[in-house]
Amino acid sequence: MFRDKKIKILECIRQGQIGGGESHLLSLMENINLEIYDPVVLSFTDGPMIERLKEMNICTYIIPTEKPFDIRVWKKVAALLIKEKINIVHCHGSRALSNVFKAAKNLKIPIVYTIHGWSFHEDQHPFLKRLRIMSERFLTSRADVNIAVSKSNMQTGKKYFPHFKATVINNGINQQKFNPANNFKNIRAEVNVCESDVLLIFIARFTSHKQPLSLIKSFAEALKINPELHLLMVGDGDEKKKALKIIKQLKIEHAIHFLPFRQDVPDLLAASDIFVLPSLWEGLPIGLLEAMSMGKSIIATNVDGTKEIIQNESNGLLIETDNLVHNLTNAIVHLASDKDLRKRLAEKAMQTVSDNFNATTMTRKIEKQYSTLILNKNVLV
């Protein structure tokens, strides 16, 4: 099917910090067939993902920029494509694609674009939303293959872009790594939480769309009803300083525990009882899948992507984003007080991930897109 040489793929992503897209890329690199493909990763910032890729002996490059459509880096990207003799460019997210498409098109290298959630949303300022819709329309039209991580992402694309086409390939996770039967570190002892207390966990960037501040306010209300609750918040971001200020004002420092981003996510999840994801929007949240695979009961918002995974009262609790603090408080109180419900939801959540969201299956589907593109574009390897 292929020539003697391996197919060289440049995987491009906006940052080296760990988020959903970066976790997706790590899973792809862990499972890609190295007998056929020779992956190279380009990130536009440094971070823990880069260190993990180096541990995996994946060739990595950093071309520093935090701006989309940054013409200052386009020549550097072109030089990298030529140096590494890249056959396919695979961009994860719009910022990465905006800084790579020009060089790839000039060199006639086919482009795959994975949409990890759109960059435009209903709660944005109308001008900003309009600008981002124009940007996404332009970028998706430059890709030879568009991959949507959820059906809702594909449907949104079709709604806004008349000629938009995409293949849906759901995110998948390493279910051996996120297996509750494994041995784990005692995180509760590290953060001084008793085994008998109910521990909620939030693992995400501290950004407005993840709503960490709403979670803190909701937790404070729930704590008045159930004083044996604790909340572990793991991550970094713009709203972390505000979060620390709010818990001090509310005088609940004893019940909320902060940790920076960490690699030992399975250990963190193993220590918890309830995983909370109060996002305003999602693509197909990998952190949610990891928590479900670890047998955690879920509270999440009824938003695109998430609602393709969670069925309310079946494998988790879905709440509306309208009146979020009130809805989240009620869900926390309800689930924290009902151990049998937590057990039932967790068991169903594990089954959902086992049946539908496997990283190996995801990777094989992406590889099929690569091989089809090579044949259709008659790319010399």
Give, region by region, the residue ranges found by the protein language model.
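Helix-loop-beta element that forms the nucleotide-linked donor phosphate-binding surface
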Residues: 54-58, 153-175
